[in-house]
Structures are given as C-alpha cells and as structure tokens.
Amino acid sequence: MLNRVVVTIDGLEYTVVSEDSPESIRRSANLVDENIAAVKQAAPLSSLSASVLAAMNLAESYYKALESTDNLRRQIKDYAEENGRLRAELNRLKRR
C-alpha cells in the first residue's frame, strides 16, 4: 500500500508517495531538513548548494555505516569460525 505524506524540507512542502510507513518517511525528511539547516548555519549558502552539501554529508555517513556493517559482519564470521573450532576441540577432548 502506498502512503502519501506531506513533509517540509528547507521550508518547502513535498508530497512523498512511498510504501514506507508515514513515520519512516517523516523521519527521513527530518534528517534531510536538519542536515540542510546545519549546512546553512555553518555557511551562508543557497538552498541548492546547502542541499548538495547536505547530500554529500549524508552519503558519507551512509558509506561509513556500510563500512562499519561490513566490519561487524567479518567479526561475526570470525567469531563463528572460532566458536566452531573451539566446539570441535571440546568434543575431541570429551572423547578422551
């Protein structure tokens, strides 16, 4: 089911149509709005320039989160492999 949600970003209203929940849509819009406002507060920029810089900041955060997720997946895999080795060793020792 498609949800239609009106959000305000940088003072402009947008109608977003998405299968995501209204709460999720609003949360995303708020994140974008807050990032644009932070960029504008740091430097006097046009809405377009502030939007581009905010998008760059969000993209950087996204890629850092992906990298962190990849690192966690590798750690989990390593722990699972170590767990398997330790279980095998434990079983071997129990058979003695």
Identify the function of each model-found stretch:
Residues 42-54, 58-61, 65-68, 72-75, ...:
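Heptad-repeat coiled-coil/leucine-zipper oligomerization helices
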Residues 20, 78-81:
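DHp/HisKA dimerization-phosphoacceptor four-helix bundle of two-component histidine kinases
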Residues 2-50, 56:
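Short, positively charged
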